[in-house]
Curated annotation (Swiss-Prot):
Comp. bias intervals (Acidic residues): 77-95
Family statement drawn from the similarity comment of this UniProt entry: Belongs to the COM1/SAE2/CtIP family.
A UniProt-annotated Pfam family: SAE2
Known function: Endonuclease that cooperates with the MRN complex in processing meiotic and mitotic double-strand breaks by allowing the endonucleolytic removal of rec12 from the break sites and ensuring both resection and intrachromosomal association of the broken ends. Specifically promotes the endonuclease activity of the MRN complex to clear DNA ends containing protein adducts: recruited to DSBs by nbs1 following phosphorylation, and promotes the endonuclease of rad32 to clear protein-DNA adducts and generate clean double-strand break ends.
Subunit structure: Interacts (when phosphorylated) with nbs1; promoting recruitment to DSBs.
EC annotation from Swiss-Prot or TrEMBL: 3.1.-.-
Gene: ctp1
Taxonomic path: Eukaryota, Fungi, Dikarya, Ascomycota, Taphrinomycotina
Modified residues (Phosphothreonine): 78-79, 89
Impact reported for residue 165 to A: Lower levels of phosphorylation
PTM sites of type Phosphoserine: 77, 87, 114, 151, 154-155, 165
Protein name as catalogued: DNA endonuclease ctp1
Keywords: Chromosome, DNA damage, DNA repair, DNA-binding, Endonuclease, Hydrolase, Meiosis, Nuclease, Nucleus, Phosphoprotein
One of the record's GO cellular component terms: site of double-strand break
Length: 294
């Protein structure tokens, strides 16, 4: 068994040699295929050139055949026009054509005229000419206006303006354009309010300090001291609880007595203390000073 396995095994040098031979064969085959590709490309270029030359020849031959056919048709038409019956008689010169103008006028006799009546014996020298209606061509009247060529290209607005008087034309051209302007091209928005389309919005206060909060909610608000109110209190001094500002009313005037103390008077001592949801900004220094500058 060992001898059989030894015989089946192949040395690595033999395998290496076989692989080298295969690689050489592949390289030779690749070189052969590349040479075939080069030859095929050359043949393809030659065939394309031959096809282009054949196409140009066909185009030139077709153009020459068309030109020759047109010339033949023109020659046929000219020969048909020359072979008109009675053309030999036309070539003969008419002796009356070469006659002078005075001799031609002598053959025409002018009938006598009367001062009040129309021409007499007009049928003697005027021959009625009968022309078939089919041969008469109706000619359209041409526009004698110097701007007639431009009138076909003008707009409807300009045609309406031309029908007006010159004075109206001047006023219209000075006050308004020839055509209405488009608002979208001017970049101006249409600010006209549409009635009934806008819904009524709920009222929203413009200022933050307009809200009024009372009761227990007011106690929960943050307290702050206003320096301006405190300064006002210091300048005017505290108001005594026992004293009340005199008021000139009917009771004082008649009875001469003094009014009882007001229950809101102790609150004056707490001036400068505030409670608000949104604390306002402080007033700048010197805002309330009204002294005249020297």
């Amino acid at each position: 068994m060992n001898e059989e396995e030894h015989n089946k095994s192949v040395h690595w040098s033999i395998v290496y040699r076989q692989l080298g031979n295969l690689l050489e064969q592949y390289e030779v085959e690749i070189a052969r295929l590349k040479s075939q590709l080069v030859l095929e490309k050359k043949l393809r270029i030659q065939v394309e050139k031959e096809l282009e030359s054949v196409k140009t020849k066909q185009i030139s031959s077709s153009a020459s055949s068309k030109v020759s056919s047109n010339t033949i048709q023109e020659l046929d038409s000219t020969t048909d026009e020359d072979e008109i019956p009675g053309s030999d008689t036309v070539d003969e010169e008419d002796p009356s054509l070469n006659a002078p103008f005075s001799e031609k006028n002598q053959s025409v006799k002018i009938p006598p005229h009367s001062p009040t009546l129309p021409v007499q014996n007009a049928s003697a020298f005027v021959k009625p000419i009968s022309v078939p209606l089919g041969n008469v061509k109706e000619e359209k009247f041409l526009d004698t206006n110097p701007i007639g060529a431009e009138s076909f290209e003008s707009s409807d607005g300009e045609m309406h303006l031309r029908a007006r008087s010159p004075e109206d034309m001047i006023l219209l051209r000075e006050t308004q354009p020839l055509a209405p302007l488009d608002i979208n091209t001017l970049g101006v928005s249409d600010n006209r309010q549409k009635k009934g389309t806008e819904k009524k919005r709920p009222f929203e206060p413009e200022f933050l300090n307009d809200d009024v909060i009372r009761g227990n909610k007011r106690k929960a608000l943050p307290a702050y001291e206003c320096p301006d109110c405190q300064k006002f209190y210091e300048l005017h001094g505290p108001v005594k609880e026992s004293s009340v500002a005199p008021t000139w009313n009917d009771e004082n005037r008649l009875g001469g007595g003094s009014l009882p103390n007001c229950k809101h008077q102790p609150l004056v001592q707490k001036v400068g203390r505030h409670r608000k949801l949104n604390i306002p900004k402080p007033i700048p220094n010197g805002f309330w000073e009204s002294d005249f500058v020297d």
